[in-house]
A protein has these predicted regions:
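Generic structural concept
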Residues: 8, 12-15, 19, 41-45, ...
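Amphipathic alpha-helical interaction modules
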Residues: 22-55
Length: 90
């Protein structure tokens, strides 16, 4: 359980940082489209909820180590996508 707690904590920190970066970019990076900012913030919150739930409920029939490695890979990809979107706010 300790590892799951650490993984959830990491997800919380990363998503919080992404949310803060998105807010900062929207305030200090020119005048981005408010709808784009809203959609990006919503996607960060949705991503957070989704991954926290996935940590708690391992896929049946799948080895835990494989499941969590896959989860981390997908999370990292999603984080990089969000970072690219934040960088693209104009």
């Amino acid at each position: 359980w300790q590892k799951r707690r650490e993984l959830k904590r990491s997800i919380n920190y990363i998503c919080s940082d992404l949310f803060a970066e998105c807010m900062a970019a929207s305030l200090y990076n020119g005048t981005p489209n408010p709808e784009d900012v809203k959609n990006l913030l919503t996607s960060i919150l949705t991503m957070h909820s989704s991954y926290i739930c996935r940590v708690s409920h391992v896929e049946p029939g799948m080895k835990a180590s494989v499941y969590f490695q896959d989860l981390k890979t997908h999370f990292n990809k999603d984080v990089n996508d969000v970072i690219d979107q934040i960088n693209g706010l104009h």
